[in-house]
Amino acid sequence: MTGTIAYIKKSLKELYPPSEVSSLVRLIMERVCNILPHHFLFCKDKELPESEKSRIHDIVERLKQMEPIQYILGTADFYSLQFEVDPSVLIPRPETEELVEQVILDNADQKIKILDIGTGSGCIAVTLRKHLKKASVIATDISAEALATARRNAKRNNTTVTFIQTDILDPEKAEMDIPFILDVIVSNPPYSIKWAGDDNPLL
């Protein structure tokens, strides 16, 4: 196993910062070999099966092409949950967890209706439904592929979310597709806007 770890580090050291290489090593060994970081020392002399070595080689080659590790492995962690991801959806971002946490803190134990616009992988909608037991969560996306992924993620995490395919930029259609009175609207599109002021009700 020590040789495999050295191979990963040597292959990636010119492409990624040292801290990221270390994170990639931990993630690859955990997902491919089921070896956690605190077991590395005890398993250092373990001979990995050829199937695992081949899988690791494929992963490293894709990483050398700067493909995101989440797409390579097919999953991403978000707010202590695991989500399926592929190129049809964006990879959940760490800063999105802050948005989700704020909504959870503000609405704990409330019977509310939440709309997630542009749900993508469903990470926001599924996580909110997981933690806000009394809430009803509706998630929309214009992409049928993204909604299919989001539905699988809801099932994967044992949650019930209402998924609707609609174009939120078409107000008349969106109003017909989402005939609900809403309490909270959330969205985290692939860009961010820094709003002035400390008390910002726009999430």
PLM segments and residue spans:
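N-terminal auxiliary segments of SAM/dcSAM-dependent transferases
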Residues: 1-73
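Generic hydrophobic alpha-helical segments
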Residues: 8, 99-103, 171-172
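Glycine-centered helix-boundary capping/hinge motifs
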Residues: 33-34, 66, 80, 158, ...
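SAM-dependent Rossmann-like transferase core, predominantly class I methyltransferases
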Residues: 44, 57-132, 140-152, 166
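Short, glycine- and charge-enriched coil/turn segments that flank and shape catalytic ligand pockets
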Residues: 49-55, 105-113, 134, 171-179
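S-adenosylmethionine
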Residues: 135, 140-203
